Amino acid sequence: TPSAGDSEAPQAGTSATAAKDCFNWGYDPLHFNAPEGSYASDAADGANRIVELRQMVMALHNTGLRVGMDVVYNHTSASGQHAQSVLDRIVPGYYHRLNANGMVERSTCCDNTATENLMMGKLMVDSVELWAKQYHIDSFRFDLMAHQPRAVMETLQRRVNKVTGRHVNLIGEGWNFGEVANGARFVQASQLSLNG
């Protein structure tokens, strides 16, 4: 019988892992759908990353814990023809938000993505659907969610609820700043527009 997630044994395990788990927290996104290698016994083996992450989530669920995932879709680690740029190598200048001079916006301190563009918004929605459906992630915390259009986040919420058959909690930073502040480019998924 699994114990409650807030009971002593699961909490001790969570605390022990948190104390030794020190990595970059994923704020330099490269491949949105690739499981983090540091959680696998062999990070170089892509299939192993997938299998072991699924096993980890299942084990946590079996102890009564739910799994939340921190996601960063507001920027990537690089753009243009940089070695760590992925999206610009597919369609240059489309997946990143550009300023009037054609330069990539960097208000997030990295290369901002343009989820207001149809296919970048779709990439984000499809990615969260994958994590919720295939990995059984229970909730998602969005870094700088106000850099996403409210309409895209609402589409995302409906989609993940539908494919999982349950309500998936979405939590986000609704800060109003940068080139998207005050609805400059779209109605933001911000604290102001979400009445929170």
Give the location of each predicted region.
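Active-site rim elements
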Residues: 115, 141-144
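Aromatic- and acidic-residue-enriched carbohydrate-binding clefts of CAZyme catalytic domains
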Residues: 2-62, 77-122, 126-134
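Short, surface-exposed connector motifs at secondary-structure boundaries
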Residues: 133-141
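Active-site-proximal helices and loops of the catalytic beta/alpha 8
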Residues: 144-196
